[in-house]
């Protein structure tokens, strides 16, 4: 069975345009390689009400929801709390993760762990923990009412490491299907004549989703 996914990026800095949402494109490519169709990208600020609304919409139309961001130690990092409220899951403290965060601070920062980092060791009950070897924000995944929810950190390097090491193996276990994608690169042709050339071939494909896009390269002086 194929799965449909929605990626929800959490962070007011994304909406303000201070940071480009590169995570979404990277996650989409990785999910398509394991047969998960990404149908929606959503961006919400660090606001629990708007995130809750986005999650309620996503759970009605997708069976995989993947969030990035909002797993830090500050007051506006509310992804786990909001996800748990939306799906009726209690937050529980994982002592093993708390000890891991304390050790990370001692070894890498040479400081005692600040108390507000304690919330990074709280997780939905009965979830799978995704270790974070390059930061203090572990991710996690759980299934509720037929929907798989995965939460990854926002910083791209941390997200990428966790995506490759944990999220993709988790999703690969859900389905044996794959999405086959081919790129055809041309030059000197506009989109309209290219469509005429490809129409017959596309009509012979099974369940195709053709997409065209153009790129203009200006001569340099």
PLM features: residue spans?
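Glycine-rich beta-strand-to-loop/alpha-helix junction loops that act as flexible
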Residues: 10-12, 67-71, 75, 153-154
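Glycine-rich phosphate/diphosphate-binding loop of Rossmann-like nucleotide-binding domains
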Residues: 4-34, 40-41
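Proline/glycine-rich low-complexity loops and linkers
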Residues: 50, 60, 78-174
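Conserved acidic residues
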Residues: 63
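Short amphipathic alpha-helix segments
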Residues: 189-207
